[in-house]
Regions:
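Helix N-terminus capping/helix-initiation residues
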Residues: 115, 297, 313-315, 334
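Intrinsically disordered, low-complexity regions of eukaryotic proteins
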Residues: 203, 254, 311, 318-320, ...
């Protein structure tokens, strides 16, 4: 994709310059390569499938360095008599954001399922119970992207330098200079999430009522985040590091009713309810920070602030137990009364 912009500009009258012409263009190229092999075979009560995929992505902006990603993905599934189901997936992904030796990460996942309604002992329920399936899964997911203000931060393992204007004087003239803006992190690598799921599916009366119940748990390790305990005397910003740990757990319930009125009108009604709770297990905080100010042990994006105990009354003022205001003004009747923490 090419974007062209040109400007014709006339200079101010009586200036000793010629007509100026300027042009600029940017070119963006994206090259994506993918090769895939599939396998499928059924014999007797056995059903086996397999897939292997290789991908490579090259994104180039004329004004920037190319972004490159590479990966291999594989999947194997096995089913026996449409009762016992097994699936294994694995990804081996590479990212340019990490230095050699840490660029590639291996992320496996496995799932099993049991279609109970296809068992011999369930044949007496097939007229009203059409589907009953129990499933469980475990998998790992990686993340290599770290952003500040929505901007992706690349090459966390590289030292960064910026130019600054009028930094020092040489004689009577101010000169520009350069300074180190980021200290590299040679050990940074993939952020990794471990996900667990246990689910139950059911279907009643030929689809009149169906639903799912899922229990999930996720623990995320090596979260890419900034240092918060960097001493000021260091003088240089530190690149992001694998400093954080969180957990997330909960459940989700889904119910659906499907039916028809006559031959031409079909309708579906659904209800979904979910509950989730997360917690910060570890982050880069000062060791001497008071407990009520620490974010460890609290939910992500937990609000921190003063606790209001109502409004100040005349009885509070007469009692003389109000704390002294730190805002430069004396408190009065009707002001918010904050709890002494």
């Amino acid at each position: 994709r090419d974007n062209y912009n040109s400007i014709d500009a006339y200079n101010k009258f009586n200036t000793d310059t010629e007509l100026a012409y300027g042009s600029s263009f940017t070119s963006i190229y994206k090259l994506y390569m993918e090769a895939q092999v599939n396998y499928a075979r059924k014999f007797g009560k056995h059903d086996v499938t397999g897939m292997m995929l290789y991908m490579q992505n090259d994104y180039r902006n004329k004004a920037e360095l190319a972004e490159r990603y590479q990966g291999i993905v594989g999947r194997v599934t096995y089913g026996y008599d449409d009762r016992y189901l097994f699936e294994f997936n694995a990804g081996y992904n590479g990212s340019e954001n990490f230095m050699k030796g840490k660029r590639f990460g291996f992320f496996p996942s496995v799932s099993v399922g049991w279609r109970i309604t296809n068992e011999e002992f369930m044949k007496g329920t097939q007229d009203w119970l059409n589907n009953l399936k129990l499933r469980a899964s475990y998998g790992q997911v990686g993340n290599d992207i770290y952003k500040i203000g929505g901007a992706k931060q690349r090459f966390l393992y590289e030292q960064k330098w910026n130019q600054i204007g009028n930094d020092y004087r040489y004689g009577e003239t101010w000169q520009s200079g350069i300074y180190e803006s980021q200290y590299p992190n040679y050990g940074v690598t993939w952020e990794r999430a471990h996900k667990y799921n246990l689910g139950l599916e059911f279907g009643l009366w030929n689809g009149l009522l169906s639903g799912n119940l899922d229990l999930f748990y996720e623990k995320r390790n090596d979260i890419l985040t900034q240092y918060l305990t960097r001493p000021q005397w260091v003088g240089v910003a530190m690149a992001a590091a694998n400093l954080g740990k969180t957990k997330n757990s909960g459940y989700e319930i889904e119910l659906k009713h499907a039916n028809h009125i006559g031959k031409d009108f079909n309708y579906t009604v659904g209800l979904t309810y979910s509950h989730a709770k997360n917690e910060i297990l570890m982050m880069d905080e000062p060791d001497l920070k008071t407990d009520y100010r620490k974010r460890e042990g609290h939910p992500i994006n937990q609000y921190f602030g003063l606790v209001c105990d109502g409004f100040i009354t005349q009885a509070d003022i007469d009692g003389g137990k109000l704390p002294v205001s730190k805002l430069g003004e004396n408190v009065g009747i009707g002001d918010l009364k904050y709890r002494d923490m």
